[in-house]
Amino acid sequence: MKMKKELDKELYPDYVYPEFTPDPNEPFREPIAKLGKKITDRIPQKLGLKKITRNDPEYWGLAGVLTDEEAELAVKLGVRKPKTLAEIVKLSGLEEKKCEALLEEMSRKGLLEYNWENPKHEKQYVLPMYVPGCAEFFNMNANILDSNPEMGTFFEHMSRLPLEKITPFVPEGGAGIGMHVIPVEKAIEMENESVDLEHISHWLNKYEGKYAASPCSCRRSRLTHGEGCADDPEGWCIAVGDMADYVVETQKDGRYIDKAEALEILKAAEDNGFVHQITNIDGANKIFAICNCNVNVCYALRTSQLFNTPNMSRSAYVAKVEKANCVACGKCVEFCPAGAVKLGQKLCDKEGCEVQYPRIPLPAEQPWGEHMWSHNYRDVNRINCYDTGTAPCKTACPAHVAVQGYLKLAKEGRYDDALALIKKDNPLPAVCGHVCNRRCEDACTRGTVDEAVAIDEVKRFLAERDLNAETRYIPKKTIPSLKGGFDEKIAIIGAGPAGLSCAYYLALTGYKPTIFEKNEEPGGMLRYGIPSYKLEKDLLAAEIDVIRELGVEIRCGVEIGKDITIEELREQGYKGFYVAIGCQRGRKPGITGENAKGTYAAVDFLREAGAKESFALEGDVVVVGGGNVAIDAARISSRCVDAKISMFCLEQRENMPASKEEIAEALEEGIELNCGWGPKEVLEEDGKVAGVVFKKCIRVLDEQGRFSPEYDEEQTVTIPCKHVIFSVGQAIEWGNMLDNLDLKRRSNGGALADKLTYQTSEPDIFVGGDVYTGPRFAIDAIAAGREGAISLHRYVHENCTLTIGRNRRDFVELDKNNISVESYDTSKRQIPAKADEKAQAATFRDLSHSLTEEQVKAETSRCLSCGASVVDPNKCIGCGVCTTKCVFDAIHLHREIPGASVMRASEDKLKYILPNMVKQSIKVKFAKKK
C-alpha cells in the first residue's frame, strides 16, 4: 500500500519560494559583503569558494538596514563571541560614547543581541548567527520590517539555504542547529525515564522571574510574502533570561510577563495545536526562548518537514495509538504538525490479516537529495487518510463528523462529551438528527452484515440536550490570538444552515460576525422550507441560541441590496462577506397553463403554509416532483384540505430522489404516488386550474447520467384537480444585492467561486450552500459554512494565504468488500417508538419519538469500530499535540529516542555531523548492495 504521491496540481500547486531582487544600480558595499561572509553558515560562501554578491541574501539582507560603519564594527566582534563595551572599544579604537551608540543602534535594529552572562554581570554584546539570531530579531522589529519588507524573505532564505546539504546527516538531538521540539508536559508526566530538559517546567523554573512575551518572527516573516496563516503574531514566543530584557528594551515588541501568564500562553498554544520549541544552540544548560509554533509558518519546523529529516526537530518521544481505544475521530490527524498521524482501519482484510501501513524512509536508509524533499509539506501533512481508507461513516458525511467517536462516548454514557465531539464538525446536530439524509448510515459497514447502525437516531438523542438550557453545550472558543479575539468585521448574508455554520466557526475562532437575514426569523429553509412535523421550530431556535451565545449578532428583516448595500457595509468597516442566501425561489416546468390560479412553486407554498401552519386549499391537489420537497408539499397539503393528494414524478419509485423513509411516511398518510410521468399541460377553466395532463416518461437520464428526460407523447393521462404544486427545481433570488458588483455567475444564476476557498470574483465576497452548489441538504450547507469561515479568517488578515496548509477534508472509505468481521454484537437495529399514524397525519406537530437511553446503549454497541488512527514513527516529532486532542485516551507519547534530547552547542555541530555523515554513508552504501 502506498500513500498518494501525485497530488492534484489544481488543489496542490507546486510551491514557489519567495525571492527578492536588489537594485542593480545601488553601489556594491564591501563592508556589508564582508560581514555577510562572517556570519553565514553556507559552506561555499563561508570558505570563500563562492563570493558574496549583491544577489545573495547575506548581502541584501544586511545592506538595507545597516550602515557601512555598523558593518565594519560588527565584523570585528566575531560570531557568538560576547564582548563588553570596554573590550569592543579597545578592539575598534572608537571613542566609547560613539561605540556604545553604534552597539545600541545595532541592537535596536536586531543585528546584535546582549546579555550579562559573565562573572561580573557586565553587559556584553553578541553578534549572533543568522538563524536563530539576527534574522529573527530583524523581523521582530516592526519598524525595520515596515521599511524593509525584504527582511521577511531574508529570514526565509537564511533558515533554508544553509541547511540544504547537511540536514540528512544531522544526528539525533539536532547537533546544535536551530530549534528543538519540547513535548506538551502533560503528555510525559507519567514517563519515569524523562529528563529535566524535556520538561517546559524545568526551563520556566530555571529562568524564574525573567520572561517576556514577544512576537513570532516566523509569522511576521511569512506575511511579507503573502503566506501568513492568520494567527495574530504577537506574544507567542516567550523570551527567557537576559533575552527577555533584550526584546523589551530594543523595540522588539516584547513585554514582561510572570510565570502564570507564561503558562496561559503555553496552554493557549496547545489549544490551537501549536508546537512548543526551545532554542538548541547553547547545549543542555541554556535556552533563550520557548516558541509556540504553527507548522504553516514556522521555519524551525520546516527544517524537518521540508527535507523529511525528523532529527532536525524531534524530541525524544514518539506517539503510539492504543488501537482498542481509538475511534478514528480524526482530531489528532487534523492537528498533527508533521502529518505523522493518518486515519486507517481496525478491521482485518478477508485473509484475516491486519492492514500494513507504509513508513516514510529516513536518510539513514537510502541516498538523500532533493527528490526526497517535500516542498509542499504544509499541504501534504494535511492529507487525512491512507489510500486504503478509514471508517465509511466519517468519509460519507459531508461534514466528516466523528461518528464512530460519538457512538462510543454515548455507549459509555458520556453524553456531554459526545455532543461536544459532534459540535466540532456540526453546529446543528439537533436539526440534522431530524432532517439529515443519513449518508453515514448508507455507508455504514454494519449494513454489510445486517442493518446499518442508527447513527442519526443516536445523534438526535444526544442533541436534544440543547433544548434544555441546563444541559446545553456551549463550545469553548479556540482563538489564535492572545488578545482575546479579533476585531475585524465580517458580514454573513443569509441565516440558513450555511450562514449559521459560517458564523458559528468564525465565533469559535474569535470573531463577532453579523448575520443579515431578510426574513423575520433566522433559519432559512430550515425554518421556512421544512414542515414543523419534521423539524419543530423551538428545536431550531435552541441551536440558533447557542450560536448567539457565542457572540454572533443576527439582524432579521434586513435585505441586502434593498435596505443596505454591500458597498455601504464596506464603508462601515466590514472586511469580508459570506453570501449564503440559498435557492429560495421555486421554478415551474415551462408548460402551458403553469401560471393559472391555483398553481404554486413548492418552496413558495411551503414557506407560507409552514409559517401559518395552514393554507387555503379547496379540492384535489396534484404535486409534481419526486424529491423530499415534493413530499413535504404533499404532506402539508393533506393537513390543509380533506381531499385527494396525488404525486406525479418522472422517476420510478426505486430511483426517486426522495428518501425511502419520506416516501413511506407519505404513503402512510394516504398520499397517492404515481411514478414515470411528466407534466405536459395544466388545464384551465376561467383562469383557474381544472386539471393536469401528464405524459409517460421513458427515460430520465442519458447514457452519461445527465438529466435528459424523454417522453412518449402519445401516452398521456389527465388528472382533474383544483391545485397544482410544482416541485421541479429552485432558483436563486439575488434581488438588487449584486448591483454595482462584479460577481461572476453561472448560466443558472449560481455564484461562480473557487472550489476550495469559495472566493468569488469580488475578492472580499465568499459564497456557500445552495447559492453555490444548487439545492442540496442541510449537512452539505453546514460543511460549506465551515470552509467559508476558514477562508474569511484567512482573508480578513492581509497577506495571508487562503490555501497553503489548508485541510482539504478529503477522506477515503475503506474497502468493504475486503474486510472480515469476525465477531460483533448480534442485536438488531433499535427503532424509536412510532407515532400514531392518524394523529401525525392530522397535525403540524412532530409526534415522532427519540430512542430511549437504554436503546442508545444497545444501538451504539452495534458499531463495528471500523477506523483507527495510525502513526508513522518515522515522521513523528514527539510534540504531543495529538494527546491534547484525544478524549479517548487512545494516543500517548513514549520515550523511544533518548538521543534526541542531547543538546549541543552550535560551535560543535560539525564534530557530530561529520562522523554521523560517514557512518550513515557507509550504512546506505551497504544497504544498496543488499
Tell me the role of every PLM-derived stretch.
Residues 8, 338-392, 453-455, 459-489, ...:
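Flanking helices and flexible, charged tails adjoining ferredoxin-like Fe-S electron-transfer domains
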Residues 107-118, 341-342, 891:
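A short, conserved structural fragment
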Residues 401-410, 452-456, 492-560, 587-590, ...:
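Beta1-alpha1 glycine-rich phosphate/pyrophosphate-binding loop at the start
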